[in-house]
């Protein structure tokens, strides 16, 4: 799991048994896969188009879910644990770290 640069933009991928799968929502201009847990949930950030700000994503069971913190210009996930708790950061005039899990969000200011 990681990302590669093709000379223009970054693209997330998952490598499993010497087979590579691109991890990127349909239509996205770029993606960065940053973390994976034991259930193979992948987290990271992507840009819906070249002019858009970054949005956080989760990828599990072949389904992408996008996350944007309200009022943020940028959101990304950096890691995920086996319980599905995610760490990341978001920009709301300044950079704020956060911990998010099922039913909670803890902002670090």
Residue positions per predicted region:
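Residue-level hotspots at or immediately adjacent to binding/recognition sites across diverse folds
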Residues: 1-109
């Amino acid at each position: 799991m990681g990302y590669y640069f093709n000379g223009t933009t970054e693209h997330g991928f998952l490598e499993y048994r010497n087979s590579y799968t691109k991890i990127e929502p349909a239509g996205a201009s770029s993606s960065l896969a940053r973390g994976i847990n034991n259930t193979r949930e992948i987290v990271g950030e992507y840009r819906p188009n070249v002019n858009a700000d970054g949005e956080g994503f989760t990828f599990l069971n072949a389904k992408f879910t996008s996350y944007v913190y309200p009022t943020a210009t940028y959101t990304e996930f950096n890691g995920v644990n086996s319980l599905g708790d995610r760490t990341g950061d978001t920009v709301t005039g300044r950079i704020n770290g956060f911990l998010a899990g099922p039913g909670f969000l803890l902002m670090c200011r």
